[in-house]
């Protein structure tokens, strides 16, 4: 397991970015972060809902030049 990871899901439509992020979070240690890069505008709403439902913390959500960047912390941090 790693302390942090980046997942590039640019070009994919929802729900694929959230599904792939959920799978990627299993590969990072509890308390570690996953940065997700997406281009689907619906991803902002989807990642907020995903965070609420799963308990993974959405640390930030930003957009720059059409790329959405989400930073999630895997639940279970010490």
Question: What positions do the PLM features span?
Answer:
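Amphipathic, hydrophobic secondary-structure cores in small proteins
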Residues: 9-61
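Short amphipathic
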Residues: 2-10
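Short acidic/glycine-enriched loop/turn segments that link adjacent beta-strands
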Residues: 65-67
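Short, low-complexity Ser/Thr-rich regulatory SLiMs
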Residues: 62-63, 76
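Core SAM-dependent methyltransferase catalytic element
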Residues: 70-78
